[in-house]
Amino acid sequence: MTRPLTHALFVNSGILGQRTFARFIQNAFTGQQEGVRATQIVLTEGLTPAERVLRRVVCSRLWRDGWAGMTNLDFMRYRAEWNAGWLARKRIRQLEQSGARFDVLHFHRQATSYASLRRIRTTPTIISIDCTQRCAMQSARSRLEARTYAPNVRRDGDIFRAAQLIISTSRWAADCLRDEYPDCTTEIAIMPNPVQLDGFDPTWIEERYARATETPGYRPRVLFMGGDFRRKGGYDLLAAWRDGQLGQHASLDLVTSSPVESRFLSAGVAVHVGVAAHSPEWRALWRDADLFVLPTWDEAFGMVFQEAAAAGLPAIGTRINAVPEVINDGQSGLLVAPGASEPLIRALNQLIASAERRRDMGARARDFIVQSAHPDAYRRTLAAAIQRVANSTQPARTIR
């Protein structure tokens, strides 16, 4: 018996790592895969001049971050997330006007659904999250600053309660949601982000080991990738690199979209700006690296740690939020506290010193990511969830 075709609309914010998920959806559901026909909206694509102007106005900062030691007193986060939701609603209406019909809506992440609450209550909907507002609130430096996120917290709660299914990238995010919204009975499925494994060759692991053990005077290459250099712990890493004199026996490649102050650079450090994800240069940096480090202060999940694992690299990360769900401390990498310079120096020295340990940790990291984030398995699980949600209520309807 032929399985009925389920029409799904994916709405993606198109910012930062969300573009990677959009690329996955585009590839995974080309045509009709697993009984699902997919249409996708990426909000950063096809913006009109008027939409760009509106975004600039709505998302403009009225309170400079750091004034009086606080941020977000102008409710910048809520305005930006509402703008994403408004644009998503507009794009959905445009599809509706062309006669589009969908069985299921999939919003990635929750901000894209902010202006679609009524639609969620009438159309089976999946909300994909990697965190609640706790990520922002735990960085607040005062009670007043924490309260500025209250509108986001309330809107998130309304969305979560109305959805048919919530897909969380981690156990940590799922637990946060249950803790913060105890009255929310919506089912939560834990599904780590899929990783495009075909971009990372498993033979790199032995290739690195051979390079390190057969090259006289070999200097291991340490790789950092983080767009917001300061928030991702870039300056903490540079301080540790300098204080530990690590440049004497290793090199450090910094890949970032932020300017890096030259006065913090020391021996062995190279800065790479403007490297596009999945480009040949990006792939070469992963291949040539011997270990990965990101001593981040603010990370909900850390897709880049998944990419490091896919590349067969041991990773040094921080013991925050869902990062320990990706890095098995002592097995596939090492975890330190944010801002802890001496532990970071020790972790770097441990991995720089041993090609055998790097190889073994990298192999375990690769095995873990193949098991937990294989794109084919994710596609099958997501397709099954879409069909289950679609069949839990009435059949397809025109979006309203």
Q: For each of these PLM feature ranges, what is it?
A:
Residues P314-G317, I327:
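Short hydrophobic beta-strand element within catalytic cores of glycosyltransferases
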Residues W172, P194:
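Carbohydrate-associated surface elements
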Residues D329-G330, L334-S341, Q350-E356:
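Conserved acidic donor-binding segment of nucleotide-sugar-dependent glycosyltransferases
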Residues E207-K232, L238-R242, L252:
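Conserved donor-binding/catalytic core segment of Leloir-type glycosyltransferases
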Residues T256-R287:
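Nucleotide-activated donor-binding/catalytic signature segment of Leloir-type glycosyltransferases, i.e.
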Residues A146-I166:
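Membrane-proximal helix-turn-helix segments that form the acceptor-binding/catalytic region
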Residues W297:
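Aromatic "clamp/platform" in nucleotide-sugar-dependent glycosyltransferases that forms part
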Residues Q350, R357-S372, Y378-A384:
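A short, well-ordered alpha-helix in the C-terminal region of glycosyltransferases
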